Amino acid sequence: MERQKRKFVAAASCEGEGGRRRRMTDRFSNLPDQIAHVILSFLTMADLARLSYVSKCWRELCLSSPVFNFNEYNCIGDADMCDSKLRLLNILERFLSLRADHKIQRFRFDWHLPPPKNQSSSSSSSCGCRDVYYRVMSCVQKVVRCNVEQLELNLLGLGEPNLKFPSSIFLCESLKSLSVYTNRAILRAPSSSSSFSSNLKDLQLLNVVIADDEGFFKWISCSCKCIRKLGLDHTYMIKNLNIESSSLERLSLSYPQPDLDTLNISCENLQLLSISLCPDSPCMTSLNIFAPNLKKLWWEGSLMNHPNLRKFQSLESAEVCFDSVGKVSLEKTQKFKSTVIELKTRVDDFEPLSEVFHGLRINEVLILNEAAIKVMFKLEGSMPVSFNNVQSLRMNIGCVTDEIVPSMVSVLRGMPYLRILYIKRCPPFHELESNKCGFDIGYWKLQNLAFINRLEFFTIEILEWYNVVELARYVLECAQKLKKGVIICSAQNLEEVKRKLEKCKMISTAAIVFKERPKSERRLLF
């Protein structure tokens, strides 16, 4: 009936001059309401308001739309007068009142003004008026009463710090997703929440103040039985984060202020955990994580705080970064088939970082940067982690200088079952006058490296001379099981390297492929 009425209005409005009636094809009017609402969901609130003036039919359609995107800047531009903002909120409140009982599926409220074009003008990128803030909160509560399911509030450009955020919003039974981005508004757990069961599945809080951290996370643990995602980004006043949930699957904590004192997580179904602590954060008094089904872990902080990866039996990938040392990345399966170790340039001690995954067996694929290779050489014979089962190794090296060659030998000696070797040219790059001509093929043969008898594939980037060419010769002449080799050269030395290596007395029947390094990569190098 509603669709027929809309088509009648469209036809009746198309009378030509002189009384002659013409019918106009109105495809939009023929659409079901559900499809029409999907199309309208791409419009801002201002556009919906304009469209509602076309006809009574369009007004009813706009008012019944379940999706709204309110952007204050699109409505009043650079105006910074509180009166203008209050009039705008009057229109919004009127619009919400006219909706009656129509349900809101998603409401996005954006009051994040861009910086003023003229810095010397009186215009500001934020409105510090309390009246405007409380009127906005009043509008938000009206939205909540419309049984909203998804609510996104970007209020960074609104109000002064430490204004209260209405905790009654957390008591909305229909609410499934809530995102709050404020100018350090104060959040508290709802007071009458002892018997309330929230349907929240996704809660994202950014730049907010958690006034009662113990009470707030107790409310999440006890009342949010359906929650799956919890994000806390640049939150304030969280000293104790204690959370217990059987439904939570993703937890993210980024740079809490001030530093955490306790972090206790007990989430049996947690699959993704991301923790980013501030640099040089002090040691926590309590750090306990129970997550038997954890699959992905990201941890960033200082050496004072780190998890024990051995506890996570279902872990598929992990990256642990320390501001003063470097990072360890582990990928795929609980035995970590891919491991990346990147140390900072001047780090000379690998042992603190290795404590993160002490006792684990690193299998399959290993990627090392130059700093890590040098540290392993210093720790030869006393490495706290075994790499005996590594089958694929990639060395990211700036240049194969005389200084790095003994370190490379040390690493290769600890991997007797290596099948794939890739030596890649990566920053930091050394000066051209660096010594690169002290180790010939004879040196490599004297090392009696066990991996050479199992090596099947190798790739090497030759962008400088002698040491790296001699290493390539060693592989070609001694790797009897070699199946394929790829040699990447710059355009300037491709033919010369090819002529030199073609003279090798290869012990295998491997296919050797010579490739020119792409120009885009050469520009990055030189």
Q: Model segments located where?
A:
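Leucine-rich repeat
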Residues: 2, 21-247, 254-256, 450, ...
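C-terminal closing repeat unit and adjoining cap/tail of repeat-based domains
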Residues: 2-20, 419-526
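N-terminal helical submodule of small eukaryotic multi-pass membrane proteins
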Residues: 319, 342, 355-367, 374-375, ...
